[in-house]
Every structure is written in structure tokens, then in C-alpha cells.
């Protein structure tokens, strides 16, 4: 590795020879290695071997020393004491102290940082870390408001580095041995940015969304509005301790920037970055809104938008035949999207707001088609839906009621009792025509509040007290749509449904005979909720009794074994002439077995007639 060549590569921008480092290490070998590395990086190095020599050097050459790089184990107690002394001294706290050690232990690192260390390096030291030591000096002077050393040889322009770039981290900022890949290679449009965009101020100029527009080839040309907090470099002569008067507008360059390949990492405190507030999805810029309320979409996003919108239109245009022409995304008094020369699609603000509504319609495949466009237009029986989605048994209530239902609502408010009608049209010839000349539509089950008790029943067997079964109506539906179960309140015991309408102030009854062909078989009637609960309760009790029975059996077996081996507390059973001596006076085992069987039978009988079962039977 040619360190000299690498360091010379960075001398075009940063002059490290103006930085003086005080190196302290009690190990001669380590001291020589670090001294060589710092010298090859063009730093001015002063080497000492003890904490006392560090204090003496600071007292003698304090104003000329910029950075202190010290070993923590001098021993450690002295190293910590030296660190505490330097960070608490008012004249020396401008000097950043960087501790180094072979111990990579978290408690030691935390203790050093709490005492005021600027950084903690683990040996062996790497070139990147040494090349970046000057940034600690720059931060400290900047934080304290002191004058800065003129280390930058040339003015340069900022090239914002990607956060995901492996070179953008806290250890290789401004280093020369990294893979210095500029973002120009990945974004060729960045070089075409105007000089005015590069000089925008953070404090005065907002980040405009138009900077992220499309170029001629459809690629993104958004510029990262990055400005540096850099004071004028021509007025830095003077003492290091002289306070610097801050610029009233620090977010501007003192001179015209020049293009370069210097990578500035975002994690560094050397520059202030303006983070882009525009979110990016899938490598594309989001839609942009200009001043006149138009929405600009990229070519790829616009194509996806057209596909999704076309799906929604194709799935619902059959339900909208009342309109002569199906226009794509035509809103009230607004024009459709326009396509300009560069491939961007412009949407008005109203159309942009309805973009998500139309897209969700296409994705859901028209879960609920518009059943009516008003009180004067209805769908005919011959209309079909492209995707016949199976609707659930419970339909949502339509926003616009048919004319007949509205009249029923009005009549109910006037005091007349009306039953919701269900049009049973078996064919087009049997369609009922009202006074207005419109054909009666296939009405869906509407449930009007306050008319009567309109309860959706699961089956006809739910109401046995009426002595009949209410059939499921099977009216004619549009092709591709499944039938809905129609339920009627069980107040009419005949197999005829009374359709009531109010004409000329009088109530007339129009009877429609229902065919019992749609009745479900009685063996398919589901068990009601009460029966299911009772069955589950019985099953649970049986299992509980079985578990208790097993426990009792285990207890009886243990008792039998214990009684067959009688013993006195603290003594063993004595044997006389090979015969067991029963000290407890228990009967023989044969007699005991008979009595045990009788006890088990009694327990089983008691279990069969338990209080829980008696309560259940009653």
C-alpha cells in the first residue's frame, strides 16, 4: 500500500501538513508505528511517552497543538487523569483528545467518552482513521466559535453521497483510500444542474418539488439542495484563540463553487445537509404538484395508473350504461388527463383526488356496483356484469332508494302502514308497470326503520310457531349474479306475498304466487344456537367426569398398594417363619378384593346420578 501516493491524492483538497498532532504512547514500538503512519499522512507530529510530558508540551506549545492522540494505558489511571485535566481546562478544551488502545471494551469506551474524549480508536490503527483526524479539530473549533485553519487548498462543489454507499460512514469521510465513486456515474443528469440551483440557501430558499421533475428521457433530475456552513476562507489570518464572528447567513458559500470528485459523507459534522422531503418509492420520484394545481406523474407510474383505472372502468361500465359514453376519469366539469411531450401525465387536482378511489375500484373488482344513478334510471334485466362477484347474504343499503321505496317511506310518515315490496318478475311480460311508466326493478331487500320487525332469519325453521315455512324467493337476476335470499316477516301465513302500493290515495293489493320449488329440504336445517350450546355443555361434562374417574381409579390403586404393605411408623414389616405379620389388623387380601369391588360399583352408581346430571335433567 502506497500511503504517500494516497495522501498526495488528497493534498489537492486538504492540506494536512497544517495540522499538528501531539502523540503519547508509553510503548516504543507502538509509538514508532503510529508516528510513521501520521508522518506519511503529512501531519506534523510531536511524540512523547508519558502523561507528564503531555502536560509539559501543552504548557510550552499549547497554541500550536491541534489534536492529542494518546494511549489510554499509561497506565490507565494516569491516562484517565490526563484526559480529565485537558477537557476541564478552559484554555485546553479547544484541543480534541483522541484515545487509543488495544482494549476493545465497551465500559472503557463509555468512560472515555463521558470524560470528554472526541473519539476512541482501537489498535492497530487504520489509515482511514488517521486521515480523518483533522475533522475532529474542525468540529471542535466550529463548536467553540474559534478561528479555523485554512486547510482547504481549493474551493470545491458538494457531491451528496448516498447513505447506502459503503464509503459513507464515520471512519472514511474525506479519506483518500476509499472507493471514491461519484454519483455522477449513476445520475448523469446531475451535471446539467444550473449554477443557481447549487447556490440555493438553506435558510432562505425552500426545497421546491419541481426540482425532481423528469428529463427528456424520463430519468429523475432532482438535485440535493446541499449547502456548506463554511466561513470565508480569505479572512482566517490571526491567532487561533481569536473568536470568530459568525456570518449572519452561514448557509452560503463565500465564492463560486467548482465541480470536483470529493465525496462528503452525511454523517460528518463538516457540512449541513438538507434532507429531501420528497419520498421515493421503487426508484421513482413521486407525483409532483405545481403551482396551478396540476399533478405530474412519471411515465412508468402513469402507465400503471392507466392499467388500474382501465380495470375499474371495464368492470363497472356495464353498470353505468345510462351514460352515453364511458369517459376515463371524467369528473364534474373537468377534462381527462393530458399527456405532454416529455411523457408526463397531468391530472387536475379533482381528478388526482379521485385517483385512489378509481384504483381501489379496479383492484377490488367492483365489490359493490352502482345499482342506480338516480331515481329515474334503472338497470334492465339484460344487463350483465363482467365479473360476477358473489355477494354476501347481507347486502349493504343503497344510497338511493327506488321510486317505489321512496313513496313507501313518505306514506309511512303520513301514517299509512306499508310493507316493503319485493318484485317477483319471472319474465319480462309479467313485469309490473306503475303509473309513471317505468318498469318495476328487481328490488333488493331494503329494511326501513320503524315499518315492522324486519329480522333476517337464518332458516324457515326459526319460526315454528306460525305453522308454516317461509320459502326463499328466487327472483330473476342479471346474468352472472347469484341469487339473494329474500326473507319476509311471518305475518302472512299464505304462500303469497302481498305487494302493496299506494295509488291515488288508496291501497291496492297485487298478489304474486310463489313457487315452493326454492324451499330448502328439512334435513338441511341447521341446529340452532341453543342446541349447539347444550350439546357442547354435555360433551364437556362427559369429559370432566371421565377425567375425575381416572383420578379416582389412580387413587384407589395407590390405596390398595399401601394397604397391602402395612407398616408401623418408623418400622418395617416383620416376617415370622416366612409369613407377613399384619400389624394393622386388616383382613386378608381376598376378602379385601371383594369389598373393593363392591365399593367401586357403589362409586360408579353415585357418579351416574351426580347432582350435576340431575340439575341438567330438570
Curated annotation (Swiss-Prot):
Subunit structure: Interacts with PIF1, PIL2, PIF3, PIF4, PIL5, PIL6, ABI3 (via C-terminus), ADO1/ZTL, ADO2, APRR3 and TCP21/CHE. Both the phosphorylated and the dephosphorylated forms interact with ADO1/ZLT.
Domain description: The N-terminus (1-243) is required for interactions with ADO1/ZTL and APRR3.
Organismal lineage: Eukaryota, Viridiplantae, Streptophyta, Embryophyta, Tracheophyta
Residue stretches of biased makeup (Acidic residues): 590-606
InterPro entries for this protein: ARR-like, CCT_domain, CheY-like_superfamily, Sig_transdc_resp-reg_receiver
Chain's gene name: APRR1
PTM text: Phosphorylated; during the day. Phosphorylation is required for optimal interaction with APRR3.
Location within or outside the cell: Nucleus
Tissue: Expressed in leaves, flowers and siliques. Restricted to the vasculature.
Protein name, UniProt field: Two-component response regulator-like APRR1
Purpose of the protein: Controls photoperiodic flowering response. Component of the circadian clock. Expression of several members of the ARR-like family is controlled by circadian rhythm. The particular coordinated sequential expression of APRR9, APRR7, APRR5, APRR3 and APPR1 result to circadian waves that may be at the basis of the endogenous circadian clock. Positive regulator of CCA1 and LHY expression.
Chain coiled-coil ranges: 588-610
Organism of origin: Arabidopsis thaliana (Mouse-ear cress)
Entry's induction text: Expressed with a circadian rhythm showing a broad peak in the late day and early night. Negatively regulated by LHY and CCA1.
GO MF annotation terms: DNA binding; DNA-binding transcription factor activity
Listed GO biological process terms: circadian rhythm; circumnutation; cytokinin-activated signaling pathway; DNA-templated transcription; flower development; negative regulation of gene expression; phosphorelay signal transduction system; regulation of DNA-templated transcription
Note from the entry: Subject of targeted degradation by the 26S proteasome. ZEITLUPE (ADO1/ZTL) is the F-box protein that associates with the SCF (for Skp/Cullin/F-box) E3 ubiquitin ligase that is responsible for marking APRR1/TOC1 for turnover. CUL1 is the functional cullin for the SCF(ZTL) complex. APRR3 binding competitively inhibits the ADO1/ZTL interaction.
UniProt record similarity statement: Belongs to the ARR-like family.
Polar residues: bias regions: 161-174, 187-200, 246-257, 324-334, 375-389
Primary site of residence: nucleus
Sequence ranges assigned to domain CCT in this UniProt record: 533-575
Domain Response regulatory: 20-138
Xref: CDD domains: psREC_PRR
Region ranges (Disordered): 161-200, 239-260, 316-338, 368-395, 573-618
Amino acid at each position: 500500500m502506497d500511503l504517500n501516493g494516497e495522501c498526495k491524492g488528497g493534498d489537492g483538497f486538504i492540506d494536512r501538513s497544517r495540522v499538528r498532532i501531539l502523540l503519547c504512547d508509553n510503548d516504543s514500538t507502538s509509538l514508532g508505528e503510529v508516528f510513521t503512519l501520521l508522518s506519511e499522512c503529512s501531519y506534523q507530529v510531536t511524540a512523547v511517552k508519558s502523561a507528564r510530558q503531555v502536560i509539559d508540551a501543552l504548557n510550552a506549545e499549547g497554541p500550536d497543538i491541534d489534536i492529542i492522540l494518546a494511549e489510554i494505558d499509561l497506565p490507565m489511571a494516569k491516562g484517565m487523569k490526563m484526559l480529565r485535566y485537558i477537557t476541564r481546562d478552559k484554555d485546553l478544551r479547544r484541543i480534541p483528545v483522541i484515545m487509543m488502545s488495544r482494549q476493545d471494551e465497551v465500559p472503557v469506551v463509555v468512560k472515555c467518552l463521558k470524560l470528554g474524549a472526541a473519539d476512541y480508536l482501537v489498535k492497530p490503527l487504520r489509515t482511514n482513521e488517521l486521515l480523518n483526524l483533522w475533522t475532529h479539530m474542525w468540529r471542535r473549533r466550529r463548536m467553540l466559535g474559534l478561528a479555523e485553519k485554512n486547510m482547504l487548498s481549493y474551493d470545491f462543489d458538494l457531491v451528496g453521497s448516498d447513505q447506502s454507499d459503503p464509503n459513507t460512514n464515520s471512519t472514511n469521510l474525506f479519506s483518500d483510500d476509499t472507493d471514491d465513486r461519484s454519483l455522477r456515474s449513476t445520475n448523469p443528469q446531475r451535471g446539467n444542474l444550473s449554477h443557481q440551483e447549487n447556490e440555493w440557501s438553506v435558510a432562505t430558499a425552500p426545497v421546491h418539488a419541481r426540482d425532481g421533475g423528469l428529463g427528456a428521457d424520463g430519468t429523475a433530475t432532482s438535485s440535493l439542495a446541499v449547502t456548506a456552513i463554511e466561513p470565508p476562507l480569505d479572512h482566517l489570518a490571526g491567532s487561533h484563540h481569536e473568536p470568530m464572528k459568525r456570518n449572519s447567513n452561514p448557509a452560503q458559500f463565500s465564492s463560486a463553487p467548482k465541480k470536483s470528485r470529493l465525496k462528503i459523507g452525511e454523517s460528518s459534522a463538516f457540512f449541513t445537509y438538507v434532507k429531501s422531503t420528497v419520498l421515493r418509492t421503487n426508484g421513482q420520484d413521486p407525483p409532483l404538484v405545481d403551482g396551478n394545481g396540476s399533478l405530474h406523474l412519471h411515465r412508468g407510474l402513469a402507465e400503471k395508473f392507466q392499467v388500474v383505472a382501465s380495470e375499474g372502468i371495464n368492470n363497472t361500465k356495464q353498470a353505468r350504461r345510462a351514460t352515453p359514453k364511458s369517459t376515463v376519469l371524467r369528473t364534474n366539469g373537468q377534462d381527462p388527463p393530458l399527456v405532454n411531450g416529455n411523457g408526463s401525465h397531468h391530472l387536475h387536482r379533482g381528478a388526482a383526488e379521485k385517483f385512489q378511489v378509481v384504483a381501489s375500484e379496479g383492484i377490488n373488482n367492483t365489490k359493490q356496483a352502482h345499482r342506480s344513478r338516480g331515481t329515474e334510471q334503472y338497470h334492465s334485466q339484460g344487463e350483465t356484469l363482467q365479473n360476477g362477484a358473489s355477494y354476501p347474504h347481507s347486502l349493504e343499503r343503497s344510497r338511493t332508494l327506488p321510486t317505489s321505496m321512496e313513496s313507501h317511506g313518505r306514506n309511512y310518515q303520513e301514517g299509512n302502514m306499508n310493507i316493503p315490496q319485493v318484485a317477483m318478475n319471472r319474465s319480462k311480460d309479467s313485469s309490473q308497470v306503475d303509473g309513471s311508466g317505468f318498469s318495476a326493478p328487481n328490488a333488493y331487500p331494503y329494511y326501513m326503520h320503524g315499518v315492522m320487525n324486519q329480522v333476517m332469519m337464518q332458516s324457515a325453521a326459526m319460526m315454528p310457531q306460525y305453522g308454516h315455512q317461509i320459502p326463499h324467493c328466487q327472483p330473476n337476476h342479471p346474468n352472472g349474479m347469484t341469487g339473494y335470499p329474500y326473507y319476509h316477516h311471518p305475518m302472512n301465513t299464505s304462500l303469497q306475498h302481498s305487494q302493496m302500493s299506494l295509488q291515488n290515495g288508496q291501497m291496492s293489493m297485487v298478489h304474486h304466487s310463489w313457487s315452493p320449488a326454492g324451499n330448502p329440504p328439512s334435513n338441511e336445517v341447521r341446529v340452532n344456537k341453543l342446541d349447539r350450546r347444550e350439546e357442547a355443555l354435555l360433551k364437556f361434562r362427559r369429559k370432566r367426569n371421565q377425567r375425575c374417574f381416572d383420578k379416582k381409579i389412580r387413587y384407589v390403586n395407590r390405596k390398595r398398594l399401601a394397604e397391602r404393605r402395612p407398616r408401623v411408623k418408623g418400622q418395617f414389616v416383620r416376617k415370622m417363619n416366612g409369613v407377613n405379620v399384619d400389624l394393622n389388623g386388616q383382613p386378608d387380601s381376598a376378602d379385601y378384593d371383594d369389598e373393593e369391588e363392591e365399593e367401586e360399583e357403589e362409586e360408579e352408581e353415585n357418579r351416574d346420578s351426580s347432582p350435576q346430571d340431575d340439575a341438567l335433567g330438570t
